[in-house]
Amino acid sequence: MRGLTLSRPLSLDEHVYGLGEKAFDLDRRRGFFQLWNVDVGYVSRYGWYVDPMYVSVPFFMVFDTKNAVGYFVNSASRIFVDVGLFRYDRLTVFVPEESVELFVIGGPGIGDVLRRYFRLTGMPFLLPEWALGYQISRYSYYPQDRVLEVVKRHLDMGIPVSAVYLDIDYMDGYRVFTWDPQRFPRPGELAEKLHEMGVRLVTILNPVLRVDQRYPLFGEALGLLVETEKGEIYTGTMWPGKSAWIDFLKPEARRWWSGRVRDWAERWGVDGIWLDMNEPAVLGEPQRDCTIDPGALHEVGGRRVRHAEAHNYYSVFQAEATFRGLVEAGREPFVLSRAGSAGIQRYAAVWTADNAPSWDDLRLQTALVLGLSVSGVPYAGLDIGAFAGHRHYRSPHLNDLDLLVRYYQIALFFPIFRAHRAPDTPDREIYELPDRWREKALRVVRLRYRFLPYLSALVLEAHEEGRPLLRPLACYHQDDENVHAMYDEYYVGPYILYAPLLGREDRRPVYLPRGRWADFWSGRTYEGPIWIENADELPIYVKEGALIPLSAEGGLDFLLFGAGGRMKLRDGTVAEHRDGGLVLTSPKHINEVIRLGERVERIRVGASTDRVI
């Protein structure tokens, strides 16, 4: 096989993070990986150690207790990476190209490497505040009246909802940018009523057009489609039947798609776009990984490029065009993409896609989202409750409500907080649950909203400074060998350590690294490094020096533990804890100041102020 081999020594005390969505331990040592985006459900069986998956990022870092170095291979081809599996003392990258850009990114810290990677490939987009809330979805909510009923039932029971998603069944014959006239006879009215309830509308789009002369968009897009080596339109099977793929590598095609997204959002009140099947997936082509023929042709800068050389960046270019269309429509752009690669962070969030409910999967989802975060994909989530039903995997856990609640709990701080399920699964909206499990799930959702000001501030930090929301413990404790492979607890921003429960038991060991910590619930303090046992089903620990804004009725609460905390809020206000008091650069309505210590002290303010002593 022709190509380039890049290799470097790998010592026993070095660890490796990155490579995107990998069903593997957070530390990639002793793994062999392909970077090639696929629709996992059609190529293999979703689960631990399945490779490849939906999001392939040709970026990784090698670190020890003192130093970290990053490597970015600027290629969209099928890359193979051996992280000390076949040769214990070598890390080897094979790229099937005769030349490639390789960027070496200095540290010395893990966070330093990440920030420089973002400066190289693009800073994360500013995720809208509403996109941090609870999003509800199903394959599929229809007809139109049912969508409104589902949202209303949530709100009537005091369950906050920020957005509702429409899957492919809203379309007319699965043609993008159309509405099924029977199921959705008044789509503009749908968005209007949702907006009156304070809920956004997100619709799914696929990267294909039905090959049909009666479908106006197919005629418009002639000359903008992926072609065969003979210069004919490349066709295959997708949801509409015989389909053609838009060539998103072609600037004219991206401009055309942006225009369609703009018109769609403006005309129908759509707030966000959900991109699916954009690995790109082709149904019924297992011999080609269920994707476009590697010999099919794209147009890049006036030259023809084989799909094999462009594959992993296809979704990034689609996300860019979608993002720009929403901007043109005057929206705060929100795009959720199934596939991605280097640069996806500039335009879209991702989710881990078609998982099946199981206790093993619960652990896997935590590893996947944290692994994406340290691969330069800071906005990620999962299908809360798990997607797949009987048709996919015949999971014995479909009706396990304890497991369902655990999915909500692990997702508490995930940047994307969305419930989604397959059509052959039982209804699992929170209001459908028996009392015990409903209260547990609702507790998570309400706590999520309590932390929204903090999460929103972390989004601003990601956008401006290149710091992901979720951070492995090694980001702050690189010299602590205990944490290098740890994925079942992590930092949320600089001040919170979260150790979600990943089994049926309500207790687990929690490692608190060096420093002073306080239990979020009781205020009890600990001096790390120390192993403890959690006291609550949501094990949250606050680091000394914390300043955490929390939502409160009509304003904010501020949680403080020790002095020295600083946080820039979403509106640009800087809050600092200094000289024994809380100081803000602009007045805010502060409900309470909560001080953690051996007990929880609450100071009632209830006024607009820029200083609390």
Model-inferred region functions:
Residues 1-128, 138-139, 144, 151-156, ...:
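Catalytic and substrate-binding clefts that recognize carbohydrates or anionic sugar/phosphate headgroups
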Residues 8, 61-63, 72-75, 83, ...:
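Glycine-rich, histidine-containing beta strand-loop boundary motifs that form or position
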Residues 38-47, 52-62, 118, 147-151, ...:
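Short alpha-helical segments and helix-capping/turn motifs at coil-helix boundaries
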Residues 54-58, 66-68, 76, 97-99, ...:
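Extracellular structured ligand-interaction cores
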Residues 123-137, 232-245:
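N-terminal small/glycine-rich loop or linker at the start of catalytic domains
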Residues 160-441, 476-477:
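Aromatic- and carboxylate-enriched substrate-binding clefts and catalytic-loop regions
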Residues 323-333, 340-351, 361, 372-382, ...:
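Catalytic core of carbohydrate-active enzymes
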Residues 600-612:
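A short amphipathic beta-strand at an alpha->beta junction
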